[in-house]
Structures are given as structure tokens and as C-alpha cells.
Design a protein with these regions (language model features):
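Extended, highly charged
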Residues: 1-303, 307-494
Length: 494
């Protein structure tokens, strides 16, 4: 690709140049439920309730209640599109991200004069200040607790060490200057920073950058152990682009933000302050989450007190639907990279590729392509699966297949499971292991082996052919031909 992607705008320009990757509408859309309802049909995919499909990204150019605002959705809701945006073959994205972690380029802080995100500044002390009017954040369903920022790059630092981190969190706009922030239990990344600051009685400065280079959005989804506490994931995005991500000093807090973001929210996580997530809707629901279900509202969530909202001239809001293919891309590609890295270090050359399948939202299920080259490799495929669970503790199921199976083709994977697996010997269960709280089946009500919500029975499906049986499982081999000789306009399906 000749177009260089450095921010959201250049990403959109690239997609505009590729047929079928972007659509627009200037028909007025209500950001409350209607916008997400439209995109569900256009291109959400993932674990969204059917009917849905993987389709183009979409820009809404006439947003009710927000004159002049634009909202873009689905930028990453296609693996092929992510390949365009990161300049990689879709099937090689996991390898590219693995290499980026190893060759990290730390972010740099630039002068405020270069901060495009601060072309317009709104202070919380300004008359009429209201984040709900300044930011066209959608409400995905009629049951949602409120409007959510779903693609905010949350950036904060350890109050003692100064180490910084960036992550994406569930952010609900609660009032004119307050946002609730959901943390997955376990105090990873910013959660650990918040707990330390609160224990010391200090508010935690935090910036939320919205509308950034897609490389940043995907890099921010890495988790321990691949990126341990204090590892700044912006350095992964730097490696992808071959140059450091530029940060700028915030206007009202002692923290940095992404300099070319479309919007930045500046604020502080308050000490001891908590808010009921659905205080404004009273639905008992939060928002649609990546497993495909609407998450329950939390009774008590930490509160961000907003100090300012800054943005570029004519800013573009970016959002996503929680269960969409967009989440699969953001969470799944780092999952693949993490598994590839851990297994390759333990048994070089055996794992050929990994796919974090859409049905698990990019987190719950992975298909591993394993190549057995010598008799002693028999059984090592299951060791690879165990390593995958260590690489991503939230992973619930692993499907193992041979190198002749296309892991990105669900029919091919199911074919392998149907013709190469016997359930009594090829399914390995590991009960009582911590997994993810947003999977509703990870609950004592669903199994006697589960003692606490968030615990699961992890499962390995070994659909690989035993090494000494390979001769009996050869796939039919067809003649290689040039189809275009017979059908000049024919295109091989990718």
C-alpha cells in the first residue's frame, strides 16, 4: 500500500481508495440504539445476533443531537481490512504482531504545538460544559446503561514508578462531567495503577484518546504475560509503523495523550468514588459485550471526574459494537501473537499458525495448526494447547488441527473434527480454571466443578492425525490448473 497510515483520517483515506471497504450515509441517525442497529446489518459480524455479516466500515455523517458530527464504526470489523490498515497479509497478522512486541519502539512526547488533538479545548469549568453534548457516543441497544465510549485509549501511569500503560475499557457517560470505568477483575494494567493510587489516597490522572491509528487500537489489547505490568503497548504500535507514537502533554492534568487523536477526554479517577453503572437507565444492563450477551450493570464502578475535552477541528468519533468482528480483530490478533510467541519458544517450528476464532470474540477459542515432523511430536500438540492457555488465561477452548487444514475456514476445521477425532480419547477437559467473568456459563449454576463466577472447564479438542496413521488420512489431491484459461474473470476465493 502506498498510503501511509498515521491516524484515523489517513486510515479512512486508505479504505476509501479500496473498493468495498467504506460506505457512508447522510440520513439522520439517532446515536441511541439506531446507529448500532443499522451497522448490525451492514457489517458487524462477530458474535452479534443473526442476521448480521462481515461488511464494510461505515461513516454516519448526520448524527441526531450533534450538528456537524461524524461517527465511524467497523474500521477493524474485517480481518482483510485490518490487513490493509496494518500492511500485512490477513493470515500473517499474528506473526506481525508477535514480531512487533519483540521490536518495540517507545512513544515520544512532543511539544503541545504539535498536538492536533488540542485544536479545540473545552474546560469543565466552561459554562454549559457537558461531555454528553461534546462527544457523540452511541448507546448500542435500548437496554444499555447509557452512551458508551467503546474505543477510548485509556492512558495512565503508576504513581510511584512512572511506568505508563494504555488499555481499552467500558466507559459510560454518567453525567456532564463524570464517567464510570469498568475494570476486569484481576488488577491488570491500569487496574493495578488505580488500586495503588487509591491505596495511597491519590487520584489517578487519566487521558482517553478516541479516534487514533488502528495500530494503537490493536496493540492496546495485549495482556500479560506477553506484555507485563508496566509494558507500554504504544511501543508495539510504534514497531508496526516503524516510528514512535507521538504523545502530547494534557491541558489540565499531569499526563499525556495521543497527539493526533480526534478527541481526548482528560480527567482523574477519584479516590473512593463509586457509581452504579445503570443509575440513569435502571435497566440492570450495561452494554453488549464481546461474548454476544448484554453484560449486567455493575453496582459500583470507579468514577472519572472529567477536567476537559479537547479535539481536532471537525472531529470524527470512532465507535464499535462490543460483540462485533471489530472486537475479534482487536482482541484476537494479539491473542494469536501471544500464543505463537509462547509455543514457538517451547517447541520451535511446530505451530504453523493460530486463529482466535470469531465465535469466541477473539478471546475464548483458538484454532492451532500443528505440524508433527517426527514420532516424538505425538502428544506435543496437546502441550502446545496447554501453553496457549498460559499465554492467554482467558482462553477457554483450543482446537488442534494438522497443517493441511485451513484454520481460517470453519468448515475445514469442523471437517477435521468430524473425520479425525474420537470424543472419548481426543477431548481433554481441565475443570476449575480461572477464565473470563463475561462468559455467563462460567458460573457455579452451570457446573458442579465451578466454585466461583469466572471459573471454567477448559477444553482441548485434538483433531490431529496420530503420527503413525498419517498415510491413512491423506486428502484427495487435484490437478493444479489455470482456471482463468476457461473463465477469464474468475477470482480464487481468499
Amino acid at each position: 500500500m502506498t498510503k501511509e497510515v498515521i491516524d484515523l483520517r489517513s486510515a479512512l483515506e486508505l479504505l476509501e481508495s479500496i473498493p468495498g471497504q467504506m460506505v457512508h450515509t447522510d440520513v439522520e441517525v439517532d446515536p441511541s440504539a439506531e446507529l448500532a442497529g443499522v451497522y448490525r446489518y451492514v457489517g458487524a459480524g462477530g458474535t452479534v445476533a443473526r442476521p448480521t455479516k462481515t461488511g464494510p466500515a461505515m461513516t454516519f455523517e448526520n448524527v441526531k443531537g450533534h450538528p456537524g458530527a461524524k461517527v465511524v464504526i467497523g474500521l477493524l470489523a474485517s480481518r482483510k481490512r485490518v490487513g490493509y490498515l496494518l500492511n500485512s497479509k490477513p493470515e500473517k497478522l499474528g506473526f506481525m504482531m508477535r514480531d512487533a512486541v519483540k521490536n518495540a519502539i517507545a512513544p515520544v512526547v512532543v511539544d503541545k504545538a504539535k498536538a492536533q488533538c488540542q485544536e479545540v479545548v473545552h474546560l469543565a469549568t466552561d459554562e454549559g460544559f457537558d461531555i454528553r453534548k461534546l462527544i457523540p457516543a452511541p448507546t448500542n441497544t435500548p437496554e444499555d446503561a447509557g452512551p458508551y465510549v467503546t474505543l477510548g485509549m485509556c492512558y495512565a501511569s503508576d504513581v510511584e514508578t512512572g511506568e505508563s500503560d494504555v488499555t481499552i475499557h467500558r466507559l459510560c457517560l454518567q453525567s456532564k462531567d463524570e464517567i464510570s470505568m469498568f475494570f476486569t477483575p484481576g488488577a491488570r494494567h491500569l487496574g493495578a495503577f488505580r488500586e495503588k493510587a487509591e491505596a495511597l489516597g491519590k487520584p489517578l490522572p487519566i487521558s482517553i484518546s478516541i479516534g487514533v491509528d488502528p495500530a494503537i487500537e490493536i496493540a492496546s489489547c495485549f495482556e500479560p504475560p506477553t506484555t507485563p505490568l508496566g509494558f507500554n503497548e504504544l511501543s508495539i504500535a510504534g514497531a508496526i509503523r516503524g516510528k514512535a507514537v507521538e504523545l502530547a502533554p494534557c491541558v489540565t492534568i499531569d499526563e499525556s495523550c495521543i497527539a493526533n487523536a480526534e478527541y481526548v477526554i482528560e480527567g482523574e479517577l477519584l479516590v473512593g468514588a463509586r457509581v452504579r453503572e445503570d443509575q440513569n437507565s435502571n435497566t440492570g444492563k450495561a452494554m453488549p459485550e464481546f461474548p454476544g450477551y448484554t453484560g449486567p450493570a455493575n453496582a459500583e464502578l470507579p468514577v472519572i471526574k472529567v477536567k476537559a475535552v479537547t479535539h481536532r477541528v471537525n472531529p470524527i468519533m470512532q465507535t464499535c459494537i462490543g460483540p462485533s468482528e471489530e472486537h475479534v480483530s482487536m482482541a484476537g490478533i494479539p491473542t494469536e501473537a501471544s500464543i505463537l510467541d509462547m509455543v514457538e519458544r517451547a517447541m520451535p517450528g511446530r505451530v504453523q499458525n493460530v486463529y482466535a476464532h470469531s465465535s469466541g470474540g477473539g478471546k475464548f477459542i483458538a484454532v492451532i495448526q500443528f505440524k508433527k515432523t517426527v514420532p516424538s511430536d505425538e502428544g506435543r500438540q496437546r502441550q502446545a494447547a496447554l501453553l496457549a492457555f498460559s499465554a492467554l488465561p482467558e482462553l477457554k477452548q483450543v482446537i488442534l488441527v494438522d497443517e493441511d487444514v485451513d484454520i481460517f475456514d470453519t468448515n475445514d476445521v469442523l471437517w477435521a473434527m468430524t473425520t479425525r477425532m474420537q470424543a472419548d480419547v481426543d477431548i481433554v477437559t481441565i475443570p476449575g480454571v480461572r477464565c473470563h467473568p463475561l462468559d455467563p456459563s462460567n458460573d457455579p449454576a452451570c457446573s458442579w466443578s465451578i466454585r466461583d463466577h469466572g471459573i471454567a472447564c477448559k477444553t482441548i479438542y485434538d483433531a490431529t492425525v496420530p503420527f503413525n496413521q498419517k498415510a491413512r488420512f491423506q486428502r484427495a489431491k487435484f490437478m493444479e490448473v489455470d482456471v482463468k484459461k476457461f473463465l477469464p474473470d474468475f477470482t480464487v476465493q481468499d
